[in-house]
């Protein structure tokens, strides 16, 4: 009890928002029964965020349209296509894409995990592909002229001995992505 009387825990100024369909309604959870389920990236992101010295909020797509981005530095969108975690049909709203794009242009950081901003029916599968620098070819079109790139290791980017599972069908959207 006296531990908490000493004040708030150390926190840096970075404010992170997790963007999904429910916003605050599903803060820090994935419906309760997905604990330690490897298929849901967001549970691992929540676990990581809970140990970082950052302020974390959970916002919905309606919150984005209402101006919630002015209060955050980083937005994380994670989940598989069509899910409420990734956003599903919320990505069909041009206002959401426009506000996030403008926010990134003005210095915000958008982080996508798994199939962020994914929705079919547009020129890109990831609606934020122009920000992410990557998109997914779902087989609905043929990707001719893919950007060629060399893989260059970046010291300190990943912890020693760790790895990231590859995913087929992804391609760079321009020659500037790193």
Task: Give residue ranges: language-model regions.
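Short acidic/histidine-rich motifs immediately flanking catalytic phosphotransfer sites
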Residues: 68-75
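Hydrophobic targeting/anchoring helices
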Residues: 1-44, 138-167, 172-174
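A short, well-structured beta->alpha microelement
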Residues: 48-68
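The substrate-binding groove and active-site-proximal loops of carbohydrate-active enzymes
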Residues: 29-38, 76-92
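A glycine-rich, often tryptophan-bearing local segment used as a flexible ligand/cofactor-contacting loop or short
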Residues: 82, 87-174
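Residue-level signal for short, function-critical loop segments
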Residues: 22-24, 62, 80-81, 116
